[in-house]
Amino acid sequence: MTQLTDAKSGIVTEEMKFVADEEKIDVNYLRKLIEKGYVVIPKNINRKTKPVGIGDNLRTKVNVNLGTSPDFIDISCELKKVEISNKYGADAIMDLSTGGNLPEIRSQIMKNTNLPIGTVPIYEVGVDSKEKYGRVIDMDEDLIFNVIERQAQEGVDFMTLHCGITKQSVDTLNKDPRKMGVVSRGGAFLTAYIMYHNKENPLYRDFDYLLEILKEHDVTLSLGDGMRPGCLQDNTDRAQIQELITLGELVDRCREKGVQVMVEGPGHVPYNNIQANMQIQKTICKNAPFYVLGPIVTDLAPGYDHITAAIGGTLAAVSGANFLCYVTPAEHVRLMKEEEVKEGLIASKIAAQAADVAKGNPVAWNKERQMADARIKHDWERQFEIALDSDKPKKMREEIPSKDEKACSVCGDYCALLMVEELGKR
């Protein structure tokens, strides 16, 4: 049984009750959203995961990517990133490790958080294939499905799988070349496999078998966008839309089989095209939860892409996206450090909160009211408690204090709130 099959049978699960309470919505309404495929709760039956709802009429969620690379393998560093994710309110974590003992790294990450854990299994397939055969493109089909099944057994809650990369989509890419080609790492693995062997993508060809594995463990399928644009010039081109049409068809097959599914979306999109991209996805994929990377709205800000992504992420979430994948200042430059994980996470949470306020989400608005109340009362500790990041403003206040403990050092004796407050007492 999966959350989806239970919902279709009219069963309200404990996970649904938990999410409904967190979101402050009626649990039967939530069950109907899950039944329609508009909401997913990524929770593998083999792991004690905090239930998190992702989808329409819920708060916008934020994911943190972390993991090793061939150039930097330090499990203690990755666990610090997990700790930061836990502390500062991530809703999910994806382990994208490609260096070191991948199963051990994944195991340690899962032991140190109760948040939903996602992976991109084709990374491990590529690493194993390179070690075994000397090249990623020599990966065999048994290895692909064995890795997926093993990760499902370990308790991975959701998996990004690039099932929409097909011979047809590769042909579209070749006929209508783009500026930057394929920038998705998993998408590149499978594109290269198709081009070299002239074979269909096993994840697409044997999709029903894949669904059997995922359904057995209630792993949520996150349909990867292997043809996502890697620069603004490539946004919303034929390759991207061709793949999206395929993903929409696969969403139908997931729902028919009782497998929870969400769809991943583009990463580099001009601001004026974001709303259209969200509407196209929601239409083609029949309101499946939409998971976007950013989107980044300019390619001119390496070192500041947590900001470019937050700008795009806000409009994306207002326009239909349900799940924001954070972007750190290190994006396009190097592997992120621990502090940059925090910066990226907070930036994405700002985007999510701003979007939820714009959409009238009652939980988001309640937090805004609480902050206003705390500011009216000059209750600094309460303000820090409510803030998305409590530590930074507290430190800043201590660095340049005001003589008046109620005021801050910007205005001091000339604080507008205090001035009007004093007049009101007369």
UniProtKB/Swiss-Prot annotation:
Domain of life: Archaea
GO MF entries: 4 iron, 4 sulfur cluster binding; carbon-carbon lyase activity; zinc ion binding
Keyword Lyase attributed: yes
Catalytic activity: 5-amino-1-(5-phospho-beta-D-ribosyl)imidazole + S-adenosyl-L-methionine = 4-amino-2-methyl-5-(phosphooxymethyl)pyrimidine + CO + 5'-deoxyadenosine + formate + L-methionine + 3 H(+)
Cofactor note text: Binds 1 [4Fe-4S] cluster per subunit. The cluster is coordinated with 3 cysteines and an exchangeable S-adenosyl-L-methionine.
Enzyme class: lyase
Amino acids binding Zn(2+): 268, 332
Annotated keywords: 4Fe-4S, Iron, Iron-sulfur, Lyase, Metal-binding, S-adenosyl-L-methionine, Thiamine biosynthesis, Zinc
GO process terms (BP): thiamine biosynthetic process; thiamine diphosphate biosynthetic process
Cofactor: [4Fe-4S] cluster
EC number: 4.1.99.17
Positions annotated to bind substrate: 65, 94, 123, 162, 184-186, 225-228, 264, 291
Amino-acid positions noted as binding [4Fe-4S] cluster in the UniProt annotation, renumbered to this chain: 408, 411, 415
Signal peptide: none
Pathways involved: Cofactor biosynthesis; thiamine diphosphate biosynthesis
HAMAP family: ThiC
Family stated for the protein in its record: Belongs to the ThiC family.
Function of the molecule: Catalyzes the synthesis of the hydroxymethylpyrimidine phosphate (HMP-P) moiety of thiamine from aminoimidazole ribotide (AIR) in a radical S-adenosyl-L-methionine (SAM)-dependent reaction.
PANTHER family: PHOSPHOMETHYLPYRIMIDINE SYNTHASE, CHLOROPLASTIC, THIAMINE BIOSYNTHESIS PROTEIN THIC
Protein name, as recorded: Phosphomethylpyrimidine synthase
Organism: Methanococcus vannielii (strain ATCC 35089 / DSM 1224 / JCM 13029 / OCM 148 / SB)
